Amino acid sequence: MAVTRAAAPMVGNCSSAMLIIGRRYFSSPFTEKLRKTNRKKVIDLAAYPPKKIRNFGIVAHVDHGKSTLADRFLEMTGAVEKSSHASQMLDKLQVERERGITVKAQSCTMFHKDCMLNLIDTPGHADFSFEVARSLTATNGILLLVAANQGVQAQTVANFWLAFEAGLTIIPVINKVDLKSANVPRVVSQMENLFDFLPSEILYISAKNGTGIGDVLDAVVERLPPPKVEAHSPLRAHVFDSWYETHHGPVVCVAVHDGVISKGQRIRTYHSDCEYEVLVVGIMIPNMYEVKCLYAGQVGYLLTTMKSVQDAVIGETLYDVSDERNMVQPMPLITPTPPCIYASIYPTNINEYNALRVALYKLALNDSSVQIQHSNSTALGNGFKIGFSGHLHMEEYDANITITAPSVEYRAVIKDNQTILKKRYNGQRVIRLLDASDFPVCPSDIDHFLEPMIKLTLLLSTAYCEHVERLCVDARGEQVENNGLDTDCIMQQWRLPFAEVCMDFFDRLKRITSGYVTYNYQWDGFQKATIELLMIHINDLPIYEFSEIMPSNQIKARAKEIVKKLKEEIPRQQYEVRIKATLGQSKKALVQTVIAPVKKDFTGRLKGNFGGSGWERFCKKLSHQKKGKERMKQLGQVQIPKEAFINVLRR
């Protein structure tokens, strides 16, 4: 693919940026000198003008070796010592190390052949496509990594098109060529057919053994373009990542497009129009190291006077306070992926609510695709309704909490009647329905409903096509594309309602294909749908925690399931408990059942003596008990244990 190289202006007139290094090594010339002197080494970042900078990322399907390749880069460039490295050095989250996947985009600065290489490691799981898109905004090219034993997978295709549409230079790399199961000719053929790569463009490596790593680093220097920046222009940088440090506050990752940013400088955000002082400037190698300045084309981090976790907005443009705002050309804001799944989260201990609240808002700083709303449950107390990108995304920030069954966002379009709109809906024509409590009280007000859709890409063996097609059709799917990659592999695209796949669709998909399938899904807007409100009543009181919004064809089965579970979970009371499921506010039951009351057998106290006044005493007791239970039914509430809520809400 042709690369247009930008002219490389020299660096501006900032005092030298110095990096103080302890026992950290970069490329071999530095390594030898440091080993001889065993002293702190000063690195001048001003020695790296834009023509000596390469900002790149690694993208691939999950488990194709991105993190392992990043580890080898760090070792070969001397950023870490081989004897002391831990695997997956850029993976910091617990779920990343447990599952061997990358969730958050991580950055690291390395030095090779007198060039500064800024690596942005990216996730490969379908739930984290926003992380990939976000990291690509800071790069000028990517390494498209494909495992030789698995070939091109669904996420490989999605990542290729993300990079291609962003105009990035792409270097194809085939990993795991040392495995016995590797089929390199087949993978080369797939990359030719799908992406139009020439065999001569493809690099062959084994990240595990370190084979071919030097060739990849050389290709990054020789084949990727330098950043297109203006060193002598006023400061213009954009925020592409952020996270929260307990002792420092928000840490902001920036890519400097124009000018220089330095410690002590006062900066302003373009979109939120807030002013801050830069307290620390640094780069990641892979840990945080402080420098004096970041120059045009370089990537690093900032610590500023930002106090709130909401101040560091992803995609924000930073500029110097002395510059006129109307002279600044802002970078385009990065639009986060709309949450696909909503779930309510409650602390298992009510005393941990404040700690959970703080943790969630710190989470939102680092991941703007997460949405947070306050929630309250009669049984579970105060909590939060969270919008996530997917199931694994939910697990990413799991803690000692109760998570309810996930649901999707529906929308109700209200009839174009200004009186109704102003009186009941504050003038809003489209109402978001995140749970049963949001459902309009008057169904006659609704013109139609909308449900979220996804575009699902599947790569699977031709032997499983019939079973997979049946599964997708049952999920109300519509096939969009069907292409054969080779004699054994086929790529299908489906358009599906997300409500049909957000629960166990992918588990069933893997089961019917024996695991030989990969998938990627993308947000694909809304379309008209037929949905209903399944309302659960206990003793004629609506219980919104158990009620759900769902497609009409699923209502009956789900109603039976919930009523059955409630009968099993709710303990017997001193009075009758009636459970029923209805459509919306209708009084007609779809499914209903009764939990019989606990009986108090006082006839034993009469010792079988019903003669004389015994029978009168017996009838008197029955009358008192009946009146007492009626009074309890009117004044009291059904006691539903917390465990019952958890067991019913979890599917």
Curated annotation (Swiss-Prot):
Q: Where does the chain bind GTP? A: 60-67, 121-125, 175-178
The Swiss-Prot or TrEMBL record annotates one GO molecular function as:
mitochondrial ribosome binding
Subcellular compartments: Mitochondrion inner membrane
Q: What is this enzyme's EC?
A: 3.6.5.-
Keywords of this entry: GTP-binding, Hydrolase, Membrane, Mitochondrion, Mitochondrion inner membrane, Nucleotide-binding, Protein biosynthesis, Transit peptide
Q: What is the membrane topology listed in the Swiss-Prot or TrEMBL record? A: Peripheral membrane protein
Reaction catalyzed: GTP + H2O = GDP + phosphate + H(+)
Q: Where is the transit peptide?
A: 1-26
- Which GO cellular component terms are attached? mitochondrial inner membrane; mitochondrial matrix
One Pfam family of this chain: LepA_C
Matching InterPro entries: EF-4 (IPR006297), EFG_III/V (IPR035647), EFG_V-like (IPR000640), G_TR_CS (IPR031157), LepA_C_sf (IPR038363), LepA_CTD (IPR013842), P-loop_NTPase (IPR027417), Small_GTP-bd (IPR005225)
Q: What class of enzyme is it?
A: hydrolase
Q: Which domain of life is it from?
A: Eukaryota
User: What biological process terms from GO does the record include?
Assistant: positive regulation of translation; translation
Query: Which ranges carry the tr-type G domain?
Result: 51-228
Extract the CDD domains matched here.
EF4_II, LepA
Family to which this protein belongs: Belongs to the TRAFAC class translation factor GTPase superfamily. Classic translation factor GTPase family. LepA subfamily.
Q: What does this protein do?
A: Promotes mitochondrial protein synthesis. May act as a fidelity factor of the translation reaction, by catalyzing a one-codon backward translocation of tRNAs on improperly translocated ribosomes. Binds to mitochondrial ribosomes in a GTP-dependent manner.
Q: Enumerate the NCBIfam families for this protein.
A: lepA (TIGR01393), small_GTP (TIGR00231)
State the name under which the record lists this protein.
Translation factor GUF1 homolog, mitochondrial
Q: Lineage of the source organism?
A: Eukaryota, Metazoa, Ecdysozoa, Nematoda, Chromadorea
